């Protein structure tokens, strides 16, 4: 009976590690879908995983809009056609007054 419990425990751990690896990524395009980016958390040794791109109205960070070695840190950029606005830190449709060019 004890051996059966150990076998079930090993099986559960193996399944969990397989699930964790399924969403991992090493670079931007090859591993993630077209509406996702390869994202690493803010902590130094965070694992990378695929996450959705920012939609209109979602939070964003103007400093995380460019990939670092093929992955993003902290937040995915806004999806194509949207820009991350500095005043509100949200993904929005581009306009004359909310593009980054107007701040430089």
UniProtKB/Swiss-Prot annotation:
Keyword Methyltransferase among UniProt keywords: no
UniProt entry keywords in alphabetical sequence: Disulfide bond, Secreted, Signal
Cysteine disulfide partners in this protein: 25-38, 32-50, 37-76, 60-84, 78-91
Gene3D superfamilies reported in the protein's UniProt record: Lipase, subunit A
Name of a matching Pfam family: Prokineticin
Predominant location: secreted
GO cellular component, one term: extracellular region
Cellular compartment(s): Secreted
Extent of the signal sequence: 1-22
Role of this protein: Cytokine directly involved in hematopoiesis.
Entry similarity comment: Belongs to the AVIT (prokineticin) family.
Name of this protein: Astakine
Originating species: Pacifastacus leniusculus (Signal crayfish)
């Amino acid at each position: 009976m004890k051996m059966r419990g150990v076998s079930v425990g090993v099986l559960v751990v193996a399944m969990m590690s397989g699930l964790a690896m399924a969403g991992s990524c090493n670079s931007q395009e090859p591993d993630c879908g077209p509406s996702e980016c390869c994202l690493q958390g803010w902590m130094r040794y965070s694992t990378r995983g695929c996450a959705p791109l920012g939609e209109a109205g979602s939070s964003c960070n103007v400093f995380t809009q460019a990939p670092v070695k093929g992955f993003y840190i902290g937040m995915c950029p806004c999806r194509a056609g949207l820009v991350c606005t500095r005043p509100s830190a949200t993904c929005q449709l581009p306009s004359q007054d909310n593009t980054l060019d107007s701040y430089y």
